[in-house]
Amino acid sequence: MEVLDATGLAERLRWEDNDYWLHLEAETPFDKYPAKQHARRVQAKLGIEDGLIYLPGQPARNNEDSDMPAPFRQRRYFYYMSGCDEPDCHLMYDIRRDVLTLFIPRIKPERVIWNGRGSTPAEALAKYDIDQVHHSQDLTYIIQNWAFKHQHTSIYILHPSSRIPGCDNLMPRIDSHSLQPAISLCRMIKDDHEIKRIRKANDISSQAHREVLANIHKYKNEAQVEGLFMDVCISQQAKQQAYDPIAASGPNAGTLHYDANNEDLAGRQLMCLDAGCEYELYASDITRTFPLSASWPSKEAENIYNLVQRMQETCIERLEPGVRYLDLHIMAHQIAIDGLLRLGILCNGTREEIYKAGTSRAFFPHGLGHHIGLEVHDVGQAELMSVRRGKPVYQQAPSLYPENFHDPVYDSETCHAPTDPQSSHLEEGMVVTVEPGIYFSVYALQHFYLPSPIHSKFINLEVLERYLPVGGVRIEDDLLITANGHENLTTAPKGEAMLDIIRQGNPGTTEILNPSPTPPRRMRSENRTPRLRAPGISKKTLQPLLTPLARAATLPTELRQQDDIDFEPIVGPSLFSGFSRAMTTEEKIQQWKQKRDSVPTAPSRPTKAKNLSPVCGENTANVQHVYMSTVSDLSSLSQSSVGSGSTSMCKNCGILVQTLDRLRQNLSSSTQTSPKPMTVPTFESRQKSHTVEEKHREMVCTDSLLDKVSIGQSNRAIGPEERRRKAQSDHHHHSRLKAATGEVKSRFSTRYTPAGVPPLMPSHDQYSITRRPNPERMQPVADTPIVPPRHLTYMTSTPQQSTENPALADLGLPRASAEIAAIRATKQAGQEKLDTQRTTLDAFQDEGQRLVIRSRHRLIPQTSMPVLMSQNPYHHHSNRSHGREGNNATNKRSMIDSQPAERRTRPERPERPARDYVPGDEFLTR
């Protein structure tokens, strides 16, 4: 080991700048998916410097009406920015801080024995290119906390239907229209990591195609071909297919997406095998058409195969950056028309006439290709084959301007295109397919093209019938667009190499796990510069667009400026024409550092508010806040802090201080002008009411003494016949009194409280009667004055209207003298109150209620108190009606209070039999 000494330090420092640094890329699990770089690319496409990106992962679910789990397939937009292929995860990217956070579900111990466990936070941090890992339960809190600290920034989600769990209050700040186009533009250009995965998927699929070619003469059914292909893919750790394999033999090849794969191969000429696997979520798409024998079964099959192969090779030769893909599609149609004219299938017209009529779409109904990546028909497909529609629209051939891939349009009347169509230009880093084909669909020909006079005149039926058994031919490869041309990622054999494998039965010795480092590709000479380049491609070196990094830190690290990168825009129309150039990551870092260095120092807080919190709740350092410890200190703090310091005052604090001052003024003024509140009865007022009641009892007793002298003495002198007539007259008098006082019955309420205890709530009626439980039964005696029981007290309040009734004026009261008349008037008032009590008790009898309340086993029913059953069996036996009344006691009593008198005298209700009045009646005595 070399000993470090101070003498050699200067020499080492002098040669330090000349040292060479070695960069290594590991082909091991340490080669992480570049999620952090993808997030930065999305931020650059969005063109924002602050905000939050939220993406949910695919949740785990079961099949419908089943307890078996459905096949899990991660959401591709989520995977592009996270690299995580686990269910029930979430992703959050803080743009300003450049922090990528992954939320994973917490491990459930009860499910580990069944499904295994997921990643722990430490494992996820080491596995994925992310900065932080939290459990999913913390998602709502973290996002709400971020939103509170960033009041004026937006949150970007993928779709308008997307929702952040527990964050519905943030909907006004959510942008659901900008994120998906930005990620789609980024996904169109693949980086080195993505290209490696697509190449790996192509290698595995190509080997599976070789195995099928080597064993095709052994199989007798389409299902066997599909099974062998999937067997090879699964054995190479590619357990998922990018799409359902298409193993179409004979006429089935005329169906573009045939997937039954269950018919026998006997009597068929060709098989069209369209199949490709996924590797780490990246797809491959390969199609090969081959004979089911060692040689071509017919001349017609060989002719169609050679025509399709010429279409594909011609289009592939012209793949390079800046080429408009739609032009290649039109060129493929022109080659197909020339070939079909030469074979005699098309006739009676020139290439231009058939081209304008769109008859070639009968044999080539789909587009030339599509993007491929995380999806087999990856994002950007619409841009690749799109048509920019202008105002002048003319009828054109539908075969020239397809709107959707594999969306057949069989009539020219259903498709229109502008005179100046525009589509996407190819860019470096794109991976596209080139898949021309010639098909003979009997259904499409019979129902759309042959009945149409526009197309039928160009089709030779006699020759067409000979080519119908061919079914269809399609050849498809996956190609990477490079700076100098293209690279074919598909290594599956075709042409003569394909026939050699079928004849020999040997798939070859291609090693899948270690593919060739230099796959077949078409390269330009090095001394020839490319004509058109995508933005950001260097003129000097062919370095990749993105370089995989280690796990990203919370803040971006210092990166070196690369002077050999220019950003010259593409010449001519392009997908990026008219767009301003997005800033690179290095420029973003420099801009962030400048802003960080230019931030002024935060002013110190007031000394008296050292440990206080601002009024507005936001502790920002660029403005001066108002602090408060108590409510009384608010005005003084606001006056002292507004004019102090050179920094600007916090607007929110000023608004809150002014609002509180106005509230104080309004409260102070309202206390002077507000009406006098209702006072609660005091002990002295209750004593006064008891004094008035005692005086009323004395008056009633005096009236009873007079009855002893007059009425009582006369009762001993009259006979039985007169006593009966008097009872009838008294009953008539009682009926008149009851009819006269019926209109005020609704103003009386009965309330039962213990003796000496005032009612809990003041009555809103004019009169209120309180009654002791278990009153003594008082028997009237002829020579004894009738004194009302002591437990009957009358609580009077100021009436809202006069209780005088004209019917009370003609009751026939005797007037012996002025004193007797006054006493009689007082007696009459007491008698009216007693009649009112009797009327109220009659109402209880009408409702079928027997109110027997005993002093030791009685509860006061309240609205908020449940009715309890007494433990006394005798009380329970004699109080059945009270038990029924208990559950709704308050409602029934309020119903009696508010029930008008007319409801008791309705004609449909039978009259109660009249009660014979006798002076000793117990009911009247009570």
From Swiss-Prot:
Segments for region (Disordered): 505-538, 595-615, 668-696, 711-741, 865-926
Binding site for Mn(2+) 1: D285, E435, E476
Basic and acidic residues: compositionally biased ranges: 685-696, 719-730, 900-915
Keyword Metal-binding in record: yes
Domain of life, per lineage: Eukaryota
CDD domains: Prolidase (cd01087)
GO molecular function, one term: metalloaminopeptidase activity
Biased composition (Polar residues): 506-515, 887-897
Cofactor section: Mn(2+)
Binding-site positions, Mn(2+) 2: D274, D285, E476
Entry's cofactor comment: Binds 2 manganese ions per subunit.
Reactions it catalyzes: Release of any N-terminal amino acid, including proline, that is linked to proline, even from a dipeptide or tripeptide
Keyword vocabulary terms for this entry: Aminopeptidase, Hydrolase, Manganese, Metal-binding, Metalloprotease, Protease
EC number annotated for this UniProt entry: 3.4.11.9
GO BP terms, alphabetized: proteolysis
Role summary: Catalyzes the removal of a penultimate prolyl residue from the N-termini of peptides.
Record-stated family: Belongs to the peptidase M24B family.
Protein name (Swiss-Prot/TrEMBL): Probable Xaa-Pro aminopeptidase PTT_10145
